[in-house]
Each structure stands twice: as structure tokens, then as C-alpha cells.
Design a protein with these regions (language model features):
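C-terminal interaction segment
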Residues: 1-8, 14-18, 22, 33, ...
Length: 183
């Protein structure tokens, strides 16, 4: 369900904060997007994926972060997104989270989410690549930042990690120098 509130009651925001329901909320140029908790399949895939990709990223000198961790437009207070995972150079770290140019953002699809609407924003803050995964089919799409726009690329080779992603027999297969994992 999509709802638009012209004015959000402070009590609602405080209740969401108190119950921990605001962790994945996003601020799109000052407009609050209240995001529900992801379904179980989404969370399970995200956890398994992070266990595989985080050590690879760390070995390449990248920070590994997962939801709820914010990606912020540098220098702007009310403009951030909360991807499922992101991998970024250490210099992108701030007290708020990651500022701008993450090397890779991972978005795991949920019903009625706004993954594809975020692509232009990710490009505008300098994200290098966005990996989109369907948790039901394990289908993967990779978008790369080309001159400030996210464009689909193939085959799915995550350049910043040196990882190939493909769907094999209903599983997400990740292959890298020295390893393979089926999720």
C-alpha cells in the first residue's frame, strides 16, 4: 500500500522510533519514505550474501555495511537511502554512515519497493555499481555508473569485488578467485 501524508504527526515518528520501525526509513530530498521491514526470504538472502561478500570486500580494502546503514548525499542533511548492503572505501565513512561514493550497493527486491527509482540517485552521489537481486528467483541485474547514469551491464561481474554473479538451478552462484558459493 502506498500512502502520502502531507504532514506526519510527531507522535507517529516517535512511536516508529521507539519500536525500532524506522531503521530502514529513507529521506528523499526532504521527503520521508517509511519502509516496512523486509520479508524473511529477503533477510535470509541478505544475510547469506553478506557472509560471502564482506570478507572479499575487506580483503580489497573496502568497508562492508548492511541494512540499516545509511548512504548519504555529502553535505546535505535530509537526503539519504538505506540499501540492503554497501561496500565503500574507508574515506567514505562518516559519523552518519557512508557519504556518497560507495563502490557497490546491493538492493534485494521486496514487494512494492522503490529499488529502481533509486538508481538515478545512486548515480548522482557517485555509487560505482548497483546489484539488484530478486530473492524469489535469485535473478540478478548489475547496473554500472556511466557518466552519472546507472545503466544495465552484462555479464554480471561486480568489478570492485571481482565477483561473478549468476542464477544456476534456482540458486544465486557467486564465483571469485579462490571460491564459489551458492546461495
Amino acid at each position: 500500500m502506498r500512502a502520502v501524508m502531507l504532514e506526519v504527526p510527531q507522535a507517529l515518528l516517535e512511536e516508529r522510533r521507539a519500536k525500532g520501525l524506522d531503521k530502514s526509513d529513507e529521506m528523499w530530498e526532504g521527503e520521508l519514505h517509511m519502509v516496512p521491514p523486509p520479508p524473511d526470504r529477503h533477510q535470509a538472502l541478505g544475510g547469506e550474501l553478506f557472509l560471502v561478500l564482506a570478507p572479499i570486500a575487506k580483503a580489497r580494502g573496502l568497508l562492508a555495511r548492511h541494512d540499516p546503514s545509511g548512504l548519504f548525499r555529502p553535505g546535505v542533511v535530509h537526503d539519504w537511502r538505506v540499501p540492503d548492503q554497501m561496500y565503500a572505501p574507508p574515506e567514505a565513512r562518516s559519523e552518519r554512515g557512508i557519504e556518497g561514493a560507495a563502490s557497490l550497493v546491493v538492493e534485494i527486491l521486496s514487494p512494492h519497493d522503490e529499488t529502481y527509482q533509486k538508481l538515478d540517485w545512486y548515480a548522482s552521489v557517485g555509487v560505482g555499481e548497483v546489484l539488484v537481486i530478486d530473492p524469489e528467483t535469485r535473478r540478478v541485474e548489475l547496473f554500472a555508473n556511466r557518466d552519472g547514469r546507472m545503466v544495465p551491464v552484462g555479464p554480471v561481474v561486480i568489478e570492485c569485488l571481482g565477483v561473478r554473479a549468476e542464477t544456476v538451478d534456482g540458486a544465486l552462484r557467486l564465483t571469485w578467485d579462490g571460491g564459489t558459493a551458492d546461495i
